Amino acid sequence: MRRAGLGDGAPPGGYGNYGYANSGYNACEEENDRLTESLRSKVTAIKSLSIEIGHEVKNQNKLLAEMDSQFDSTTGFLGKTMGRLKILSRGSQTKLLCYMMLFSLFVFFVIYWIIKLR
C-alpha cells in the first residue's frame, strides 16, 4: 500500500537520493563501502590473531602441566635422596660419607675440565 504524495517512492525535485545529488551520494556510498571493507579486513585479522593466541595459550598450559608433573616427580626423588643422606649421616659411617663427598668432588672436577676444554 502506497502513501499519498510519495508516488513511486522517489522524492520530488529531480533527485533520486532524498535531496542529495547523485554524484555526492554515490561518493559517500563508495567511501562507506571502502571503510566497511577496511573495517571487515581489520576485524578478520583481529579474529585470526585471537584464535592463534588461544591455541598458543592452550599449548603453553599443556607444557606447564607437564613441567608441573615433572617437578613433582623430581621433588619426590630429591626428597627420598635427602632422606637417605640423613640416614647415612646419622650412622657412624663417616668413612663412607667422606668417600662419597670425594667422589662427587671428583665428578664435578671432571665435568668442569671437560667443559673447559670445549
From Swiss-Prot:
- Tell me which parts of the chain lie in the Cytoplasmic compartment: 1-94
Keyword terms, alphabetized = Coiled coil, Endoplasmic reticulum, ER-Golgi transport, Golgi apparatus, Membrane, Phosphoprotein, Protein transport, Transmembrane, Transmembrane helix, Transport
Q: Where in the cell is it found?
A: Endoplasmic reticulum membrane; Golgi apparatus, cis-Golgi network membrane; Golgi apparatus membrane
SMART domains, per database record: t_SNARE
Task: Look up and give the membrane topology term.
Answer: Single-pass type IV membrane protein
Q: Which GO terms describe its cellular component?
A: cis-Golgi network; endoplasmic reticulum; endoplasmic reticulum membrane; Golgi cis cisterna; Golgi cisterna; Golgi membrane; SNARE complex
- Name under which the protein is recorded: BET1 homolog
